Structures are given as C-alpha cells and as structure tokens.
C-alpha cells in the first residue's frame, strides 16, 4: 500500500492548487475527484439525464463508463472532458448529481481503483470520510466565504469567463448547502483530520504546514 494523503474542503478552499503542488513536491500521483464528478455530471446531462431521472436508468448509463485521469485531464470512454467541466454550470451539475447514491457509489469504486497501491494526493469532499478512510494523512482545508469568492472569481476571470462577484457568491453558498446537507457522504472533516484555515495563508504557507505533517507521518 502506498502513502495516501486525503485533502477535503468546500469549493475554493484551496484544495486543487495545494493538492497539485503537494503531489509535485513529493513526486506523488494526484487525483482531483471533483473533476471526475463534474465529468460524469456533464456526461449524464448531455444524454438527457437529470438528478430526478430514474435511478435504474442512471445506473445503466454508468455501467459501461470508463474514466481515465491522466496528467490532470479527465477522459470518459476516451473522450477528453477537461474543457467541458470548467464552467460554473458544470460545478452546479456536479453538486446536484453527487447527491445521488448511485452516482457516488459508482465513482467511489473508480476512485479507489485509481488510488490502489499508489503514493497519491487525493482531493475532494469525502476523501477522508468515505473514499480513503484509512489514508495516512487527512487534511481539511477551510476559508471564509469572502476569501473563497475572491479566489473563485479570479479563477473564472483567468479562464475568460464573464461572471459577477454576486453570481460567484450565490454559486458557492448553493454548493456549500448541497454538499453539507446531502444524505449521502455529506461534506465534513474526518474525525482524525487536521483542519487548516487558509483564509489568511499563502499557498506556500499551507504547503509548508502539510509537508511538515507528511514528514512526521512518514517517520512514525
């Protein structure tokens, strides 16, 4: 079994940036589980499904689904979905479909297969509690809503997306509510997770804190 690091937290808490850079520094693999949820949500939406579709129909649609996560890009049945999942709409779709047990069950199995026997940094919303409950190190990143809105707004603007600060705030509030109140695998820190508030921390400071924890765990 490899050394597994779980990084959870709400949208725009810094998970993706920290997880990617941490994996690079350690020479570990990296898995963004949110990208797998967004890809599957867009895939299902493209085929006319909604979160209110019959569970059996969704299950049949997922049965032969093959997901590959290679160098930060997500492929479904060989088709690159990476660009399709960058919009705010894809994030909302992911939160809606992620409430369905049939979707989570299917993706958790795939995510565990990807992580099996690897030194890996995995980011998401239920990694430490559901996907990798035995991870060697569990981190839960959090930040104020104001800080997260600013980060998400900059991210969208960098991609050339025209969104207002108010729209981003509404999106994050909605996603927070859906993620924390869903019946299946709600967003919450694992009991043994280290909680880090990144509101006033730089990326480098967060990385240094986690790297110190990694070294401590590896030496025990």
Curated annotation (Swiss-Prot):
UniProt KW keywords: ATP-binding, Cytoplasm, Kinase, Nucleotide-binding, Transferase
UniProt entry tagged with the keyword Nucleotide-binding: yes
Subcellular location: Cytoplasm
Family stated for the protein in its record: Belongs to the cytidylate kinase family. Type 1 subfamily.
Catalytic activity: CMP + ATP = CDP + ADP; dCMP + ATP = dCDP + ADP
Keyword flag Transferase: yes
Top-level taxon: Bacteria
A biological process from GO: nucleobase-containing small molecule interconversion
CDD domains xref list: CMPK (cd02020)
Annotated binding of ATP, by residue: 9-17
Enzyme Commission number(s) from the entry: 2.7.4.25
Gene3D superfamilies with a match to the protein in the record: P-loop containing nucleotide triphosphate hydrolases
Protein name: Cytidylate kinase
Molecular function (Gene Ontology), one example: CMP kinase activity
Gene Ontology CC annotations of this record: cytosol
NCBIfam families given in the database record: cmk
